[in-house]
């Protein structure tokens, strides 16, 4: 099965929230906006990118990349705030496709590092490591070169 990765549309948000229910359940009471409202806003913000994975026009996964300036990183840092995959689909392939797009987007936006919360599941950690992410304290990160800056990331 082929998986298409594309930028999320506002109409994708309900499905993305449904897929991420276990992940975002904790955050429902954390702030004034629920996950659905926040993701809807992120679709339009220039400091965030929301991606979905599609199979036969069904959303089967998604990822959120949030950007922030970082003096320590020497430019922008991209944070993979959310990455979810429908368990009925090929988790490895969908995760790989989403991470490829997230890293490409981070490089295009001038990020010098991409970070994420360190996965506790060994299989999930292996999927991230295949993309070059390494443990860095309580988080995992991948140093990337911004487009036009010379060296690119290695695998």
Question: Which role does the model predict for each range below?
Answer:
Residues 74-87:
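Conserved acetyl-CoA binding element of GNAT-fold acetyltransferases
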Residues 1-14, 148-155:
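Conserved N-terminal entry element of GNAT/NAT acetyltransferase domains
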Residues 87-90, 115-126, 143-146:
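Conserved beta-strand-loop-alpha-helix junction that forms the acyl-donor binding cleft
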Residues 52, 58-67, 84:
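Conserved beta-strand in the GNAT
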Residues 106-118:
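Conserved GNAT acetyl-CoA-binding A-motif
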Residues 29-50:
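Active-site rim helix/loop that mediates acceptor-substrate recognition in acyltransferases
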Residues 18-31, 71:
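Helix-loop element at the rim of GNAT/NAT acetyltransferase active sites that forms part
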Residues 85, 91-104, 130:
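Conserved acetyl-CoA-binding loop-helix of GNAT-fold acetyltransferases
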């Amino acid at each position: 099965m082929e998986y298409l990765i594309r930028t999320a549309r506002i109409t994708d948000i309900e499905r993305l929230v449904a897929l991420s229910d276990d992940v975002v359940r904790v955050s429902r009471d954390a702030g004034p906006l629920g996950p659905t409202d926040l993701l809807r806003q992120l679709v339009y913000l220039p400091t965030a990118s929301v991606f979905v994975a599609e199979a036969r026009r069904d959303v089967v996964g998604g990822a959120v990349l949030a950007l922030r300036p970082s003096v320590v990183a020497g430019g922008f840092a991209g944070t993979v705030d959310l990455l979810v995959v429908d368990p009925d689909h090929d988790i490895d392939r969908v995760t790989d496709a989403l991470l490829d797009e997230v890293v490409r987007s981070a490089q295009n936006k001038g990020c010098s590092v991409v970070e994420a919360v360190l996965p506790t599941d060994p299989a999930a950690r292996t999927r991230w490591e295949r993309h070059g992410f390494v443990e860095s304290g309580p988080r995992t990160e991948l140093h990337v070169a911004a487009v036009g800056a010379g060296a690119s990331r290695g695998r």
